[in-house]
Amino acid sequence: TVMVDNRVDRLPFTPNVHQFNSDNTQVNWNGLLGRLELIARPALWLDDVRIFPDVAHRSFRVEITPGRLTGDRSKGMVTVLATSFNHGGKPHRPPPVSAPVLAHDKSSVITLVLPLGDEAKLWDEFSPALYRIAVTLESPAGRDDREIEAGLREFKPHGTQFTINGRTTFLRGKHEAGVFPLTGHPPMDVNGW
């Protein structure tokens, strides 16, 4: 059973910060949309994986939070491997990095630095080279895998403008508040998005 409870007194936000409770764009977006699935995981699994690009050092910092069900210390080995793709050249595969995992409390975080070397492919809108970063956690309880796509880029302000990897860029977008689809829910297919 799944219960969706959108009562305002149960949501942690200030008044009128979203269309959910704005007089101008209030809608009833209750329910669950999109793909729902239940996945079996080992007793020690990859609860969260976060990727942080570091252009200056040509590397990714990978923060891994293991999840566990038991109260005892859980042991395993985590491995991170990156492979570039979508850039038209030979895939770049730097050597993988590994570290032991000893999950002893809910705040255990393993931080690994994955050096990419001088052949690292940078990402920007004109050269959108990406890496598939495969994270594997192996333990006596089983194996859990996660794959994340990430680009090696540095986004920062420069005077009154922004740069990506030192190149001036312009951010484009649009605001679509108060848009009500005829179906009563957002599109659920690729073409609609």
Residue ranges: model-predicted function:
Residues T1-W193:
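Secreted/periplasmic carbohydrate-active enzymes, especially glycoside hydrolases
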